[in-house]
Amino acid sequence: CPSMCKCTPEETILCNRAGLKTLPGEIAASTISLNLSNNYLRILNINTFRNLTFLHSLWLDGNNLTFLTPGTFHALSRLQELHLSRNSRLTYLHANTFRGLLNLISLDLSHCNIFEIHPLLFSHLPSLESLDLASNNMRYVPQAFRNLSSLTRLNLYLNNNQISSISDSAFLYLNKLHFLHLSRNNLSSLP
């Protein structure tokens, strides 16, 4: 167990509020849950999580993340929940940021400064059920959600943005959309 963290017998490592600027090197490959929230992590690359293939839950909220290198999460095919909220310097996400996350159910990107969503950003997430994009700087809702058509249930949070326009086909194939939250935006009409 890394010295600045707490570990449990259930393969959970709690490194929240540990003052980390980089990932501790002593994280066991068998780790199932890793909490790195409220630290000073800035950039994650393709090697950051490569040995943590059993990870189911990952908390990276409240850090100083500025960029997520495409392929960062590629080895995490078992990951079910990913928390990236409150990374206020995170403004852009590459189209392949979430490639490899085949079992991801919940993705929290709220309270970042994301202003644009690439149309293919969520196309690698066939199991996604909950997507939180609340309190960002989005002004436009593109066709990025079209690829989420196979979902059994989707909760989509787009509240507290600056959205004034929504693509006519933004929600076209979301037949299983369960909940859509668009409050506190600049919308004058809906498609």
For each of these PLM feature ranges, what is it?
Residues P9-I46, L52-H56:
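LRR N-terminal entry segment and analogous cap-like coil->beta motifs
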Residues I13, L34-L36, L55-L60, L79-L84, ...:
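Conserved hydrophobic beta-strand positions in leucine-rich repeat
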Residues A18, N39, N63, N87-S88, ...:
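Consensus "Asn ladder" position of solenoid repeat domains
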Residues K21, I27-S30, R42, R50-F54, T66, H74-L79, N87, L90-T91, ...:
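Leucine-rich repeat
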Residues E26, N47, G71, N96, ...:
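Tandem-repeat architecture and repeat-register "anchor" residues
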